[in-house]
Each structure stands twice: as C-alpha cells, then as structure tokens.
Design a protein with these regions (language model features):
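Acidic, carboxylate-rich catalytic segments that either coordinate divalent cations
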Residues: 225-285
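Intrinsically disordered, low-complexity proline-rich regions
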Residues: 133-142, 176, 277-282
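A translation/RNA-centric and nucleic-acid-associated enzymatic feature enriched
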Residues: 220-224
C-alpha cells in the first residue's frame, strides 16, 4: 500500500487509508464540529494516553476521549473504554488526518456519526422571591468593583501556566474563576486577559481555558458551578465528588478557583494567589 509523505519534522508518515481499516463511531462536540467536518487537513498529536488523544487541528485543540474519560467541552467522544482506545502507539509529534467527518489514525477511522452539545454554566437570574437565586448578580456589581484590564492581566499572569502537566494547577483554578464570572456576566476583563496569554500555557490547557471563558466545561464541572452560584448546598454536595475525582489534582484546583471567585466576585482583581495546595477540599460558598 502506498504511504502518504508528510512534512519534515514530523516523526511519522501519515496513515494509510484502505478498505480494511477499523471504523469507530464518535460524537463530535458542536464546538469542534466545523474542524472535524471541514476539509481534510494534517493534524499533529499533542499528547496521548489511554483515555484521551489531543490533536492540534489548524491551530485548535481537538480532544478525542473514551467513554470512561471526562467529556471535555470540545471533545470527540467514543463509546469504547480506554482499554480499547484506537490510538495506542501514537505519541506527541505524530501526524494524523482530520476532516470530512473523519479522524484518520493508523489503521483506524474515527467517524463523526453525530454531534453533541457541551454543558454551559447557566447565567444568574435575579429573582427576589426565589430561595435559590444567587446572592450576587452582575446588575449588583458596580463598575468600580469590576477588575480593570491591568488588574486582570496581573492576576492571570500570576496563575496561567503555573504547575506541571497538560493542565497546570493555576490554569485549573483560572477555569473555575472564569466559569463563575461568566455565570454572573462579569467575565469580560478576565476572559480577555486569559486569551491574551494563552501561549503561556500548554495547548491542551489553552483550549480548556478558552472554552471556560465562554462558560463551557465538562458536565460535572458545570453542575458544580451552577449549584454553587445558585447557593444550593445539597446540590453542591452531590456535584463535588465527581469534580474532585477529575485528574490527579485538576478537580481540586477547579474547586479552589470556583470558591475563590464566589468569595471575591466584587474584587476579582485580588484573585492572584496561586493555589497553595490541591490535597484538601476547599469549601464552596
């Protein structure tokens, strides 16, 4: 079978497309559908482990995750378990093809069979007659209480990219802050500052932060933010374990960011502390 040459610098040649290739159906996030269903392009593997494959597609990160992984907001989700993931052997720097509704791996085509819509935090609605109405709403945050661009940039610079791994601890905390701020309609300056510094962190983490700036996150995280913003302790207690179980410390760092944003929504310019610990549970509210 004829192999397709790829550009110099990539460690492998492109996959062979043939009649005996395995086909695995997947559900593509509405946030990534245009990339996966667009023209066929070369993509680069950013990272690979059993539950997930992270691809750079035309400068955007497209995660591909198994059924037992956290369903990231921009992900292509498969029904197979991580033990049967079709990307074994792929490593950072390898080349694959993405487009025309397919993710073409060596020996396997992942087919975008359907589209799924990721979870998004609910905007706060102020209802004085509702016990579950948030105690804080964007209409109650005076313009002088909102962070200036300079304040937001200083705070974001203190957190972004801080810590090891594909999603550093500082980024996870920032994601929690962004989600709460988006729910309250006050994310503008912080979101702009984060997007201006996305090159300061990993490509995978940058994609997660970009989604969080628009209120998107894994369903487990959105459930916790919605419960915390609504001031519903029972719902928080139900949602918290699933978030704390995310990654080695990512869930705990997200909780730190969520709690910090809830406590200091009127002074977001002071959210500059790097998470000191990810080994304990931070109360929310």
């Amino acid at each position: 079978r004829r192999r397709m040459p790829f550009s110099a610098g990539l460690r492998r040649e492109g996959p062979v497309v043939g009649p005996l290739r395995r086909r695995v159906p997947g559900a593509v996030s509405a946030l990534s559908a245009d990339l996966v269903r667009g023209p066929l392009v070369r993509a680069t593997v950013l990272g690979s482990h059993a539950p997930g494959l992270y691809l750079d597609v035309a400068g955007a990160v497209v995660p591909v995750v198994t059924a037992d992984a956290v369903p990231l907001a921009t992900a292509v989700r498969l029904a197979v378990a991580s033990a049967d993931a079709p990307w074994r052997g792929l490593a950072a720097g390898d080349a694959v093809l993405v487009g025309e509704g397919l993710i073409r791996l060596p020996g396997c085509d992942i087919v975008a069979a359907r589209t799924w819509r990721p979870a998004r935090v609910r905007p706060v609605t102020h209802d004085p007659h509702s016990l579950h109405s948030s105690h804080m709403h964007s209409s109650h945050v005076h313009s002088s209480d909102r962070p200036t661009r300079a304040q937001a940039e200083r705070c974001v610079a203190a957190l972004i990219g801080r810590g090891p791994g594909l999603t550093p601890a500082g980024d996870d905390a920032l994601a929690g802050i962004l989600l709460v701020a988006h729910a309250h309609g006050v994310a503008g300056a912080v979101a702009a500052a984060v997007r201006a510094l996305l090159t300061s962190t990993t490509a995978v983490s940058a994609a997660l932060l970009d989604a969080a700036a628009d209120g998107y996150a894994a369903a487990e995280v959105v459930a916790l933010v919605d419960a915390a913003v609504a001031g519903d302790p029972a719902a928080v207690a139900r949602a918290l374990p699933a978030v704390l179980a995310i990654g080695h410390t990512s869930g705990a760092d997200l909780v730190i960011g969520i709690a910090a944003a809830l406590r200091h929504l009127n002074s977001l310019g002071h959210l500059c502390q790097t998470p000191a610990s990810t080994t304990h549970t931070t109360p929310i509210g």
